[in-house]
């Protein structure tokens, strides 16, 4: 369990580690593979969130998913180019709710580079990246004593 003071400090950094949906490049589940490939090849992220037109979270997709789907189904480039990405989207993705705990985020980010934040209605709210959490932990290590007093028991 994380000490209450540490969790309070880290949650105070939430603005720095929660990237809202409106500031992200996302794909719509009906986009075709050509569109997704173009977007993914121009980004630094290896995966991006996939949502419906109504902002319902579907999953995530990366170039590897697109290539694997094409090879698995032996599809030509022409057919693949027009195929909706919903068929190749990874749906078994770890997510957190907007009322996440730091413990939950830290445990899930061990295996994922980012966590989608999805509300109870399934609406995509944004992401928390491993990099942003590491920056918050760095701030904790450098700035904690400016706000809190550290004493030995």
Protein language model regions, located:
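Tandem CBS (Cystathionine beta-synthase) repeat/Bateman regulatory domains
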Residues: 1-153
């Amino acid at each position: 369990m994380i000490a209450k003071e540490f969790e309070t400090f880290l949650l105070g950094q939430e603005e720095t580690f929660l990237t809202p949906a409106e500031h992200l490049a996302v794909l719509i589940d009906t986009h075709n593979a050509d569109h997704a490939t173009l977007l993914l090849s121009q980004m630094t992220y290896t995966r991006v969130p996939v949502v419906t037109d109504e902002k319902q979270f579907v999953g995530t997709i990366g170039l590897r998913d697109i290539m694997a789907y094409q090879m698995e189904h032996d599809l030509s480039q022409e057919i693949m180019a027009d195929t909706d990405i919903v068929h190749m989207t990874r749906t078994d993705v770890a997510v957190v709710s907007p009322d996440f705990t730091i413990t939950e985020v830290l445990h899930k980010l061990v295996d994922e580079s980012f966590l989608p934040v999805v509300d109870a209605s399934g609406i995509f709210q944004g992401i928390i990246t491993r990099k942003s959490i590491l920056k918050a932990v760095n701030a904790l290590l450098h700035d904690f004593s400016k706000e809190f007093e550290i004493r030995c028991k």
